Amino acid sequence: MNKIYLILILFTFVGIILANVEKAEVSCTCDENCNDGNKCTLDKCNNGCCSNTPININDNDECTVDTCNPKTGISHTPVNCDDGNSCTADSCLCGKGCQHVPIACDDNNACTVDSCSNSTGCCHTPLSCDDNNPCTVDSCSNSTGCCHTPINVDDHNACTEDKCTQSGGVTHTPIACDDKNACTVDSCSNSTGCCHTPLSCDDNNACTVDSCSNSTGCVHTPINVDDHNACTEDKCTQSGGVTHTPIACDDKNACTADSCSNSTGCCHTPITCDDNNACTVDSCSNSTGCCHTPINVDDNNACTEDKCTQSGGVTHTPIACDDKNACTVDSCSNSTGCVHTPLACDDKNPCTVDSCSNSTGCCHTPINVDDNNACTEDKCTQSGGVTHTPINCDDNNKCTVDSCSNSTGCCHTPMSCDDNNPCTVDSCSNSTGCVHTPINVDDNNACTEDKCTQNGGVTHTPIACDDKNACTVDSCSNSTGCCHTPLKCDDNNACTVDSCSNSTGCVHTPINVDDNNACTEDKCTQSGGVTHTPISCDDKNPCTIDSCSNSTGCVHTPMSCDDRNPCTSDFCSWEKGCQHVALSCNDFNACTMDSCSNSTGCTHTPIACDDKNACTVDSCSNSTGCVHTPLTCDDNNPCTVDSCSNSTGCCHTPINVDDHNACTEDKCTQSGGVTHTPIACDDKNACTVDSCSNSTGCCHTPLSCDDNNACTVDSCSNSTGCVHTPINVDDNNACTEDKCTQNGGVTHTPIACDDKNACTVDSCSNSTGCCHTPLKCDDNNPCTVDSCSNSTGCVHTPMNVDDNNACTEDKCTQNGGVTHTPIRCDDLNSCTADSCSNSTGCVHTPINCDDNNKCTADSCSNSTGCCHTPISCDDNNPCTVDSCSNSTGCCHTPINVDDNNPCTEDKCTQSGGVTHTPIGCNDNNACTVDSCSNSTGCTHTPMKCDDNNPCTIDSCSNSTGCVHTPMNCDDGNFCTLDSCCSTGCTHTPIIIDDNNPCTVDSCCNSTGVVHTPVDCNDNNVLTCDYCSIKQGGKCIHVPMTQCKTFGKCGDDL
């Protein structure tokens, strides 16, 4: 079109030029003479010549086409800006020309998809809200758009999990309430859901500790009554107390030594009955103990001397009856032996033994009062009695056990002071007795706990110095012990308040510089001062009004360009400020009536397309108008019959799948088939028998728990099933045995309290049970010792009045006293010296032929008198020197094998040689150096285990020797570097500075070094906050618009 206008203009100018050429020669006197009849020229008369100049038709308006018609003159026709695009609003702006602004097609209906067609204009296509989810109801709201409302599957039963299936059905699956905890009873309440009731584990037994294991359930652990003493019987009482009753170890066997070991219990050690006498038969009687029965050497011939030899053989040596004594007539009778009729030599002196000497006649020898007991002083009294007064063996030495041996006299046995404690040095003081001095375990180190171990070793355990205070540095001084040095918390930062928390350690709290004015930048200076610098809020945007609020900071309020005219589009331009562009209301939609109201703005009133037919989908085409599309009722569900009603719309009638069997779940499958699945009737109740009836469905018949036992109470537990609890038959009478009979009755049979002990009176107490009262055996007889035998009862043993003197007649008097009346020993035989031996009684000693020479065998011959035959002293022992002393007799002196060296064991061999075997001094203790001194014997010198290393704990193990255990210097403080040096443990504070001024460095004793980033947040969302490492940790707050990258602030800005 513009080209046409240009051609017209060109033709017009050509015509004007041609006309002027034709009239170039016209002469004139005034302008009127020059009118060429063309309104497109300016006619002038200049110097008598006409000039017809084309006039300027340009109105400088780009929105007009300027033309000139010679007949009608100038015209300014508006430019046609229609670009043939229905999606633009075409207009012309002064200075800019045609403008093609895209139109807005938003119909403010969230249920349409808005678009624009260049040919037809705006299109509003109905939105499809089908989410292909059968478990939602799909709809559309004009204001919010598609709505997918989940279908309601809740059956209001907290014990089921309610779901919608892929086919759109609803399932209610019982939830599993098992919490896998055997200590709870799991159940489900329809209203509240799973219940986990704690299981009661009390077994009403005071002797068990009741607890519960999550995996196995109730645990009834018997309480530990063991006192680790095998000599006691350990029991728990009904009240929960503990008794430790000593056990009886008497095995009633006199042939064992009964004792008890705390570790192993009763010990019955067989006693040794060997008396080292080959002439006795050694045995033991379980009732009386050791028996030493002399072997029978008697050949029933009084005329032989019957003997048992040292080797156990028997000799019968004919006796010599010739006493070589003219004072006797010697003979021998096989029945009575030698007969020596003595002379009457009685001198009427009870203290002499009257005899007759073959050479001198009667001899009156003082009687032998020696009782062969070295422990008595023996005397003869004027009445002829013999006294044996015990001697005093006390040596006034507390380090000896004083006793007396009948054969050797007083014995002073060194006392054993070994207390079986390896931690004491045992010695003895003559005045006070045993002394047990604790060994010195002190290592003079206040940082160790010094102890002596059970095996005699010494341990030096480092003590713990942790005072649980994070504000102290804990260490230990070998001289003074634990040290708790206050922690230095000064961080040399004037902008923090330094303090210490006992639990966490140093705290460096930044001082508060906030003046509560968001319009200032608050800082703390290096000297500790505070500055509040006003911030700049200019955002260089002409479309905002910049200000600052003390509470929130910079405020950039958008400038309002609203001219209160809804028919203009108001906006603000960075270059020109507020702009008001006329609004085009043509939506080019055949489905709306378009208009604009100064009060309400553009209105696009939808036309009504409803044809009142529910079987059509009514819509409107932006290009053609109303459209009535038949409704598609196929729901793609093979389990429904689809149809449509003009009044109600689509109908989806479910096909009938019911097989009239209440025991099946009837369903239609996705392929359109029908399934009848048996339903599960398990009600998870162990007290019902679950079944199903085709007519009524699930049946839960109560379980019969009758066990046909009249002695139980039958019940049922929903979780475990039948419970058969024994009935209580206890009559609270400890004297009856309570039972339940087969018919359900209860019997209380008296218990038998007979303890088979004849020394107790047996009875029964209803509260405590059997009582066994000791039997009273006092017979009121002072001459009996009253006791009791468990098998026979009371025993009244006559009092032992025996004074062990066979020379007295011993009696008990009626008042309980004892008399010892000397007996008469006169046998009216003059050939014997009559006396009495305290041990054997009357002794009728043949007259003494002793020549006081122990080297002769003295005898008496009826015809010749005393005989003195030299004796043989050979003991057939090559290790003795045999000799004879007239005063003492045979002497068998052991040869001297002692080499005066205590380090050898000296022996004489069977061949008579001498050996000196070095002794072993090994005490099997690796902590001693064993050696032997020729002067003192074995020595066991304690080994020195000090390795002069302060970083080891030196001790000694009896089995392996010196042990150098590295000292544990760990003080449990993550803020110290623990090591050991020449002075012992050191705990050096670690370096926590990470050389980053943007972190607050600290150390927690329990966790170690913490580098906490400096908090630079000024709580202003319009600034980018960071800590600058380059500026020594200074907080920087940059306007967000100046940040280079989204979400990143730092030294790279």
Curated annotation (Swiss-Prot):
Subcellular localization(s) per the UniProt record: Secreted, Extracellular space, Extracellular matrix
Keywords associated with the record: Extracellular matrix, Repeat, Secreted, Signal
UniProt induction comment: By the putative stalk-specific morphogen DIF (differentiation inducing factor).
Any matching Pfam family: Dicty_CTDC
41 X 24 AA tandem repeats, Cys-rich: region residues: 38-1019
The protein's role, per its UniProt record: Component of the stalk tube, the matrix that encases stalk cells.
Name this polypeptide is given: Prestalk protein
Gene from which this protein is expressed: ecmB
